[in-house]
Amino acid sequence: MRAMQTHTEIAPMPIPGHVDPVPVPREVTPREDGRIDLIGLPRKQIAELFAQAGLDAKAAKLRAKQVFHWLYHRGVTDFDAMTDIAKTMRPWLAERFVIGRPEIVEAQVSTDGTRKWLLRTADKHDFEMVFIPDADRGTLCVSSQVGCTLNCRFCHTGTMRLVRNLTPGEIVGQVMLARDALGEWPKGANDSRVATMAGLDFDDEDEGSYTSDGRLLTNIVMMGMGEPLYNFDNVRDALKLVMDGDGLALSKRRITLSTSGVVPMMERCGEEIGVNLAVSLHAVTKDVRDEIVPINRKYGIEELLQACADYPGASNARRITFEYVMLKDKNDSDDHARELVRLIRQYKLPAKVNLIPFNPWPGAPYECSSPDRIKSFANIVFEAGISAPVRTPRGRDIDAACGQLKTASERKSRAELDRLAEEKLAALG
């Protein structure tokens, strides 16, 4: 890169490399009241904060254990609800700390039951999360960044600029909010008002079925806004809390992290997080993948597939998922399908392929492949002995489907969203 430009043309943003895997143009703005949000912090750090605030080491460790339990097992958002902590201690905690959640700006429900939330950070940046209910599972699609830097051509999020990384608290806070909305904390831990604010029609008759034993939220996919491996430390720390047996206690086998191919971070992902891996492949030739997934210009298909072959823990029991969006006349021919099979076999990958019908958005430069073309592609892969299900689009009517996140916040002005949020709060009393 030149040290100085002598003309007014703006140079394109370079694709970040392994030297700086977290390209962040903006830092998190501290809370105005100076209090520290405990959500997203491990027990050890909570104990250290309590000690710094004046508790002796033994008391700090005990209080941290108690608070951690109330945060992640009970889902409370108020220190006064922590009944095994002395009443005199609760105001002391409330003066210094806060139990945060991302602010809910808007909640939408699709005709197919998919739910999408437009959320806002404490420093006023918007992002989205999606809950997808199925007959045998409920999957939460979690965001890792506000915006994205990868510029994948078929993805609406890719047209956004990257604002900043989400913190561990903002990432795990999405899971907490979903549990609020689904009533998945032990009965009585939170009231129905929280669920109503989160966009769920909740009444006393529902309370018996919406419990943690009901497991409405069973799976997490890091497939929302952003590239998780460009926010590796924060994603890792958040998922450790989600998987902690004393935390949210979700098995790593029920968590999938999706990457567009940040090769230098993939091994660390397997070693330090250990969750299932999904790779946004989307093309099998250099020219096409260079166009639609520009990070391919830095980490090519062969390098990416070798990293998949080396991924810790990958096996026939824990296959790597390749995501493949079906784009008309771009990556959907029978020859493309046969090349996909060849590559998977060449690298001896324990893999399955999710074929994703392209979900349109305003101004998108591509169209979805026809149903017959998708079927032909899928049959070639399936007949080679590789699972190749065609994903049923979910939440298209509320722009919550794969590749559509961004639209809700673009359609409405910030002022209109603020007005709607105020009206909702006023209606709740």
From Swiss-Prot:
Binds 1 [4Fe-4S] cluster. The cluster is coordinated with 3 cysteines and an exchangeable S-adenosyl-L-methionine. Belongs to the radical SAM superfamily. RlmN family. Keywords: 4Fe-4S, Cytoplasm, Disulfide bond, Iron, Iron-sulfur, Metal-binding, Methyltransferase, rRNA processing, S-adenosyl-L-methionine, Transferase, tRNA processing. PANTHER family: 23S RRNA METHYLTRANSFERASE, RADICAL SAM CORE DOMAIN-CONTAINING PROTEIN. GO terms for cellular component: cytoplasm. The active site is at residues 128, 402. Residues 1-23 are annotated as: Disordered. It is found in: Cytoplasm. It comes from the Bacteria. Its EC number is 2.1.1.192. It comes from Novosphingobium aromaticivorans (strain ATCC 700278 / DSM 12444 / CCUG 56034 / CIP 105152 / NBRC 16084 / F199). GO terms for molecular function: 4 iron, 4 sulfur cluster binding; metal ion binding; rRNA (adenine(2503)-C2-)-methyltransferase activity; rRNA binding; tRNA (adenine(37)-C2)-methyltransferase activity; tRNA binding. This is Dual-specificity RNA methyltransferase RlmN. [4Fe-4S] cluster binds at residues 148, 152, 155.
